[in-house]
Amino acid sequence: MSEKSRSDTSATASLSDSSKSPSSYSTPGTTTQKIIFPDGKLTKCLAFSAFVITLASFQFGYHIGCVNAPGGLITEWIIGSHKDLFDKELSRENADLAWSVAVSVFAVGGMIGGLSSGWLADKVGRRGALFYNNLLALAAAALMGLAKSVGAYPMVILGRLIIGLNCGFSSALVPMFLTEISPNNLRGMLGSLHQLLVTIAILVSQIFGLPHLLGTGDRWPLIFAFTVVPAVLQLALLMLCPESPKYTMAVRGQRNEAESALKKLRDTEDVSTEIEAMQEEATAAGVQEKPKMGDMFKGALLWPMSIAIMMMLAQQLSGINVAMFYSTVIFRGAGLTGNEPFYATIGMGAVNVIMTLISVWLVDHPKFGRRSLLLAGLTGMFVSTLLLVGALTIQNSGGDKWASYSAIGFVLLFVISFATGPGAIPWFFVSEIFDSSARGNANSIAVMVNWAANLLVGLTFLPINNLMQQYSFFIFSGFLAFFIFYTWKFVPETKGKSIEQIQAEFEKRK
């Protein structure tokens, strides 16, 4: 028998044998056994792998922002396309509805992709799942990029659904993959890169949409065609990245391959301490069957799953996508004219990138933790919404120019607060509180909830805003007040802690 075969057989046997002894797991996906993973450094291979993995995050952010600027142009094109396709006139109202469907179906695809991501990640691996996910991106790029040439607007709608599937997969896969390849002391920093690339991509898409770049009647298809670039780049580079060693050990039972991948990521031959910790976690996870979707809401998994869902709801029900999607409308309401709202929106995107970059550093800083940054961010957003309502009320009643400028400042404060913690932390927080056996399903459920809340806010905000005007932001104030209390009362600190230590915190906070 070869050395490789003996190693893999040994790892698999240890998983099998462990089921014959008393379990250190009371429920699948949880452990009472203390497993400590060592700290490490940012190596060239780890940095390269993180860059390649987060190209999928860029795709996610790009398609959040790329529909804003060309919306009016595409609506006009839909009217002409409908006439050519069906030889019938389409009213402006129905053209607006068709474009709204194209925008909203992105979130529907995201929900489906997010819910399916755990199955795909466990079936073909984290790296394999990203590979197949890029095929969806290429199909979507072809549909949306060629729609104008073909003259068929349903291609845009179908393309948005497919790219939504792609982004749903990546919004679960990327944080999970980053968390699994990171050393203990860099989990937060590398996990935050997902949100950083999302914010960078939103900014890039906003810049591309400017009228003197791609935001014209002839060039808007190029905005969607750009989807090909990160997809092809990731496809070309993925094979140079090691597979997740935790996945390879826990799901495939291949210790030899896991050790080889870990040596590349850590740039050292001595990975014995970390590989033994992975073996212990894999052995513990193998004691009982891998938890199914329904098991995630039972026993010891119920409490962490509930908190993971609440963290995703806190992110979306904070109103951040209202600030992002309708920022131009908000800035016009605050008194900006001409092209000023568009440039203000780009400025807001730049602030979001800068603050997210700072949060990447803060999240693993000795003086801060996940919980403290979440509380600080949610509190800042709560205060910002109250102040924004006050400024808009004064401005709408004929107040001085200072009220308009104050409203803009409060929107920026809102975005800064979001980037401090609620923007990045929920994405990798889910992977920190579950072991390898439950991580895929936990991410699937949490990401599906995130996308569902995204869709809910997107569909309901404009009707509510038409009814309540600036006072509609009080709804988000209420949500934020609740999530501040919930985070303070129930959410544990996870920085630098093992799964066992985190689960002990869960028990304290029940």
UniProtKB/Swiss-Prot annotation:
Where is D-glucose bound in this sequence? 195, 315-316, 321, 352, 427
Keyword Cell membrane belongs to the record: yes
Show which residues sit on the Extracellular side of the membrane.
68-100, 147-160, 217-219, 321-341, 395-409, 465-470
Keywords assigned by UniProt?
Cell membrane, Membrane, Sugar transport, Transmembrane, Transmembrane helix, Transport
Per the UniProt topology annotation, the Cytoplasmic ranges are: 1-46, 122-127, 182-195, 241-299, 363-373, 431-445, 492-510
Which GO molecular function entries does the Swiss-Prot or TrEMBL record give? hexose transmembrane transporter activity
Segments carrying the region annotation (Disordered) are 1-29
Any single GO CC term annotated in Swiss-Prot or TrEMBL for this entry: membrane
Instruction: Note the coiled coil stretches, chain numbering.
Output: none
Q: What membrane topology is given?
A: Multi-pass membrane protein
What biological process terms from GO does the record include?
D-glucose transmembrane transport; monosaccharide transmembrane transport
**Effect of knocking it out?**
RNAi-mediated knockdown of the protein causes reduced 2-deoxy-D-glucose uptake, glucose oxidation and glucose conversion to triglyceride; simultaneous knockout of daf-2 or age-1 causes further reductions. The lifespan in low glucose environment is extended by 20-25% after knockdown, with 7% extension in daf-2 mutant background and no significant extension in age-1 mutant background. Fat accumulation in intestinal cells is increased. Brood size and dauer formation are not affected.
> Which ranges does the record mark as transmembrane?
47-67, 101-121, 128-146, 161-181, 196-216, 220-240, 300-320, 342-362, 374-394, 410-430, 446-464, 471-491
| Tissue specificity field | Isoform a is expressed in pharyngeal muscle and intestinal cells in both embryos and adults (at protein level).
Family, according to the entry, reads as follows:
Belongs to the major facilitator superfamily. Sugar transporter (TC 2.A.1.1) family. Glucose transporter subfamily.
Functionally, this protein is described as follows: Facilitative glucose transporter that plays a role in glucose metabolism and regulation of longevity. May also play a role in lipid metabolism. Glucose transport activity of isoform a is competitively inhibited by mannose, galactose and fructose, suggesting ability to transport also other hexose sugars.
Q: What is this protein called?
A: Facilitated glucose transporter protein 1
Q: Which gene encodes it?
A: fgt-1
